[in-house]
From Swiss-Prot:
Residues 1-28 have a biased composition (Polar residues). Belongs to the influenza viruses PB1-F2 family. The gene is PB1. Plays an important role in promoting lung pathology in both primary viral infection and secondary bacterial infection. Promotes alteration of mitochondrial morphology, dissipation of mitochondrial membrane potential, and cell death. Alternatively, inhibits the production of interferon in the infected cell at the level of host mitochondrial antiviral signaling MAVS. Its level of expression differs greatly depending on which cell type is infected, in a manner that is independent of the levels of expression of other viral proteins. Monocytic cells are more affected than epithelial cells. Residues 65-87 are annotated as: Mitochondrial targeting sequence. Is not encoded in all strains, and seems to be dispensable for replication. Pfam families: PB1-F2. It comes from the Viruses. Residues 1-34 are annotated as: Disordered. This is Protein PB1-F2. Oligomer. Interacts with human SLC25A6/ANT3 and VDAC1. Interacts with host MAVS. One of its GO terms (cellular component) is host cell mitochondrial inner membrane. It comes from Influenza A virus (strain A/Chicken/Hong Kong/YU562/2001 H5N1 genotype B). The lineage of its organism: Viruses, Riboviria, Orthornavirae, Negarnaviricota, Polyploviricotina.
């Protein structure tokens, strides 16, 4: 990939403005996102219930030890299906 060429990923994260609602502080920019900063971003914009679910998801994702892309995809899909079933039951 050529240097300076934005991918959809970098466009959606590096240039995302985070507005702190009601605090009067200036907006922050995610210049070099990593797992922790992305998690922080999601926690700021989510409801308390959604926030708890996202924390659980991120802790599980970050706890994986050297996952291959295939095993990660399988694990995430299983969690997503289970999560959706629970949402419909509740």
């Amino acid at each position: 990939m050529e240097q300076g060429q934005d991918t959809p990923w970098t466009q959606s994260t590096e240039h995302t403005n985070i507005q702190k609602r009601g605090s009067g502080q200036q907006t922050q920019r995610l210049e070099h996102p990593n797992s922790t900063r992305l998690m922080d971003h999601y926690l700021r914009i989510m409801s308390p219930v959604g926030m708890h679910k996202q924390i659980v998801y991120w802790k599980q994702w970050l706890s994986l030890k050297n996952p291959t892309q295939g095993s990660l995809k399988t694990r995430v899909l299983k969690r997503w299906k289970l999560f959706n079933k629970q949402e419909w039951i509740n």
